């Protein structure tokens, strides 16, 4: 059997695989804010990014290693393809962290070998030990992944894993890269690795899975029963295509059904010892932070963290819950960080009260950012009687989200009505240049604003999504706007909130436009799609 740490290790890849969700690109400050909250959540490993992809990715991983990694904190990990250039960059990026890891990988399925790598099985068996050995020469904690293991020949997989462990890999990760397997198949795959890889006892066995068939969490739980002890997952299940296995669902499944899973860890069925180190009361806070910063809305019926996860509409259910919550609820909402207590701030609240509440919500702002957030808070408090946590999150997430600002919005004015053509006048400045003003007509006020902004910026794009939702209840609620722009097949999200939804739309559009421009100037590599040319004897 694989090495057993006595519990499940939670490997969070929100900042790497999760960020590959279309439109979910994050800037450095956003990544740092999420990493700090992941540390508070208690994850064991943070995969902070793919350092070789771009200078921005390298800087983000290095900054997280410096500020989040610690002697008692999470392991900071970076991803690297099986090439010395990637591995060296990864080692340099994570080096500031006392607890650090290189995660290197290569595909093992025949379809990937033939069509992506154009390599033979023999080539891969030559590359793996050399690259793992090189990584091990740089640090002691090395994870090796067999990309597309779910569609790989098990016999070949056993050979590759044995070679990787012999070369120094301390964690072996088995990805279901395209979400193809069923729970019984995935469980059998993990059981086979435990049974037929002779040196598997020298490494922790990990799993990584996508949700293309909606089976990622079920696959992982079956893998746990068969000896997997590290789960690679993301907050809210975000990720490419249908997403990754959801961290909050996995953690709570193990928490709620601990008596069922305990025997698979060699424990007494009634053992009260948690199966993971995650602080479950931080789950809702973490989910909201990731949703706010990525602009990816959590579906209302999402398990554990959805808005309706603890809501009851049926009269029979409501009656039962009022008499005893256990009649229809298997989880106490407080366990995941939900509380009936609402702490509301108002126009008389001071800077220290706002700072303290933001820290409780997971935001650690610099003095300058706090000054700006407090100014926005006071402005909102003049227009809105009661400021709730969701209002604060909307204010600060928009601020943290600001990318490198090529364009800055200076003015928005609109006129519209039943007998008027919707017309917008906007003023825009470009990198400290003079303001430029233009007016445009549209089918509605938001369309007019976007047309005017496009005229001024002159950056080709296609607006493919506009959504607005109320942050809180009441007629004075802030409107939270998400805009997604597309260019050359890539999506760029903008997110803003204001009591005036037209102003919020303009701010969100500029936010997305700045992301688009920044991305076009610094195109990162994709760890799976951008396959390096691998020789049997790669060199720097």
Curated annotation (Swiss-Prot):
Domain Pyruvate carboxyltransferase, residue spans: 8-273
Record GO biological process: L-leucine biosynthetic process
GO MF annotations, alphabetized: 2-isopropylmalate synthase activity; acetyl-CoA C-acetyltransferase activity; manganese ion binding
Keywords, comma-separated and alphabetical: Amino-acid biosynthesis, Branched-chain amino acid biosynthesis, Cytoplasm, Leucine biosynthesis, Manganese, Metal-binding, Transferase
Subcellular localization(s) per the UniProt record: Cytoplasm
PROSITE patterns membership: AIPM_HOMOCIT_SYNTH_1, AIPM_HOMOCIT_SYNTH_2, PYR_CT
Domain of life: Bacteria
This enzyme's EC code(s): 2.3.3.13
Region spans: Regulatory domain: 408-540
Gene3D superfamilies: 1.10.238.260, 3.30.160.270, Aldolase class I (3.20.20.70)
Cofactor(s) required for function per UniProt: Mn(2+)
Pathway field: Amino-acid biosynthesis; L-leucine biosynthesis; L-leucine from 3-methyl-2-oxobutanoate: step 1/4
Pfam families registered for this protein in UniProt: HCS_D2, HMGL-like, LeuA_dimer
Reaction catalysed by this enzyme: 3-methyl-2-oxobutanoate + acetyl-CoA + H2O = (2S)-2-isopropylmalate + CoA + H(+)
Gene Ontology annotations for the cellular component aspect, listed alphabetically: cytoplasm
InterPro entries in alphabetical order: 2-IPM_HCS-like, 2-isopropylmalate_synth_dimer, AIPM/Hcit_synth_CS, Aldolase_TIM, LeuA/HCS_post-cat, LeuA_allosteric_dom_sf, LeuA_bact_synth, PYR_CT
Family designation: Belongs to the alpha-IPM synthase/homocitrate synthase family. LeuA type 1 subfamily.
Name of this chain's protein: 2-isopropylmalate synthase
Organism listed in the record: Parasynechococcus marenigrum (strain WH8102)
């Amino acid at each position: 059997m694989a090495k057993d740490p006595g519990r499940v290790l939670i490997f969070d890849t929100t900042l790497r695989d999760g960020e590959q969700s279309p439109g979910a690109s994050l800037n450095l400050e956003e990544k740092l804010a999420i990493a700090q909250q992941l540390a508070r959540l208690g994850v064991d490993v943070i995969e902070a990014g793919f350092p070789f992809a771009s200078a921005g990715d390298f800087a983000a991983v290095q900054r997280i290693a410096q500020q989040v990694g610690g002697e008692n904190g999470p392991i900071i990990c970076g991803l690297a393809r099986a090439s010395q250039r990637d591995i060296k960059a990864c080692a340099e990026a994570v080096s500031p962290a006392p607890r650090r890891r290189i995660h290197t990988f290569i595909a093992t399925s025949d379809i990937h070998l033939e069509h992506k790598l154009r390599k033979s099985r023999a080539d891969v068996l030559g590359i793996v030990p050399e690259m793992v050995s090189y990584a091990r020469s740089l640090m002691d904690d090395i994870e090796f992944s067999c990309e597309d293991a779910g569609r790989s020949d098990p016999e070949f997989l056993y050979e590759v894993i044995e070679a990787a462990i012999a070369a120094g890999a301390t964690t072996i990760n088995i990805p279901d890269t395209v979400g193809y397997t069923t729970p019984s198949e995935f469980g059998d795959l993990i059981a086979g690795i435990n049974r037929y890889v002779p040196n598997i006892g020298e490494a922790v066995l990990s799993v990584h899975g996508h949700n293309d068939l909606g089976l990622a969490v079920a696959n992982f739980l079956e893998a746990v029963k068969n000896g997997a002890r590290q789960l690679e997952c993301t907050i809210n299940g975000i990720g490419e295509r249908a997403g990754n296995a959801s961290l909050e669902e996995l953690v709570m499944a193990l928490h709620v059904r601990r008596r069922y899973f305990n025997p698979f860890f060699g424990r007494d069925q009634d053992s009260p010892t948690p199966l993971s180190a995650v602080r479950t009361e931080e789950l809702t806070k973490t989910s909201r932070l990731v949703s706010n910063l990525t602009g990816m809305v959590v579906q209302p019926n999402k398990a554990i963290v959805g808005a309706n996860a603890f809501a009851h509409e049926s009269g029979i259910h409501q009656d039962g819950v009022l008499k005893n919550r256990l009649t229809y609820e298997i989880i106490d909402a407080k366990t995941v960080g939900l509380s009936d207590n609402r702490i509301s701030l108002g126009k008389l609240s001071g800077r220290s009260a706002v700072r303290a509440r933001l820290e409780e919500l997971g935001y650690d702002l610099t003095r300058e950012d706090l000054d700006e957030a407090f100014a926005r808070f006071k402005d909102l408090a003049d227009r809105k009687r009661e400021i709730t946590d969701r209002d604060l999150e909307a204010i600060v997430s928009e601020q943290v989200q600001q990318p490198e600002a090529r364009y800055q919005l200076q003015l928005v004015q609109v006129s519209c009505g039943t007998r008027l053509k919707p017309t917008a006048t906007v003023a825009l400045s470009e990198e400290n240049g003079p303001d430029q003003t233009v007016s445009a007509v549209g089918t509605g006020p938001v369309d007019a604003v976007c047309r005017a902004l496009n005229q001024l910026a002159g950056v080709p794009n296609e607006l493919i999504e506009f959504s607005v939702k109320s942050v809180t209840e009441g007629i004075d609620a802030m409107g939270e706007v998400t805009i997604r722009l597309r260019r050359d097949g890539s999506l760029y999200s903008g997110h803003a909130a204001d009591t005036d939804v037209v102003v919020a739309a303009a701010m969100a559009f500029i936010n997305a436009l700045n992301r688009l421009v920044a991305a076009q100037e610094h195109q990162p590599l994709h760890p799976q799609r951008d396959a390096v040319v691998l020789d049997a004897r790669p060199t720097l």
